Amino acid sequence: MFYKVTKRIFDFICALIGIIGTSPLWIVGIIGILISDWGPVFYTARRIGKNNKPFKMYKFRSMRVVKAATEASLRPDEDRIFPFGHFIRKVKIDELPQLLNILNGTMSIIGPRPVAQDQFDMFRYGKWNEAAKVPVGLSGPAALYDFIYGDQIIDEKEYMEKVYPTRRELEYTYVRKAGIFYDLKMIVYLSLIHISEPTRRVV
């Protein structure tokens, strides 16, 4: 109980400080998106969170708005990303709105990464139920592994076969090791990664 309360207070304070501290990046992101492709600033993705409950995860929008089933809407997602969208994805600005999820309690700073419905359907039984006992996180040990190995693989099928299973195992491991000091250690590790190579994909 002490850990849960401490973690929630820590998450709320960090998210609030994070939003204030990164406010210039929010302004740049909002203006850049509106200039690139007029429409909603935020993109909401349905993800599975704690106790296998769905929630809306926020991101800055990086793809063009599709209003009808035109030829453009049938293109692969990669073709719909506008140039500024590529930039905010590369430097991770698109992830900043997830600080709002941390404020409202649907996410934490450190924890298993939230998964999409199709991924949840693949891993919903067994160990996944263990990972679902804690709040999903902005980052965590699986993100660190993905940074080291996942970024080297472009093919999605190869990624799902070689990287994703180990990544899921690390999510389960987090549940067993979860604690305030372990969370702080992960924050230090991930911060060092962002500082040393800020333009690489971390999560």
Region roles according to the model:
Residues 1-5, 76-80, 95:
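Juxtamembrane loop-helix boundary motifs flanking transmembrane segments in multi-pass membrane proteins
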Residues 1-65, 176-196, 200-201:
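A hydrophobic, helix-centered structural microdomain
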Residues 15, 43, 82-86, 118, ...:
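Positions in alpha-helical segments
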Residues 43-80, 141-169:
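Short, glycine-rich, amphipathic interfacial segments at transmembrane boundaries or analogous
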Residues 78, 90-94, 178:
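Soluble non-cytosolic domains of exported or imported proteins
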Residues 84-91, 172-176:
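Short, well-ordered beta-strand elements within core beta-sheets of diverse protein domains
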Residues 86-108:
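Short, conserved beta-strand/loop elements in beta-sheet-dominated catalytic cores
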Residues 100-196, 200-201:
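Hydrophobic structural segments characteristic of membrane proteins
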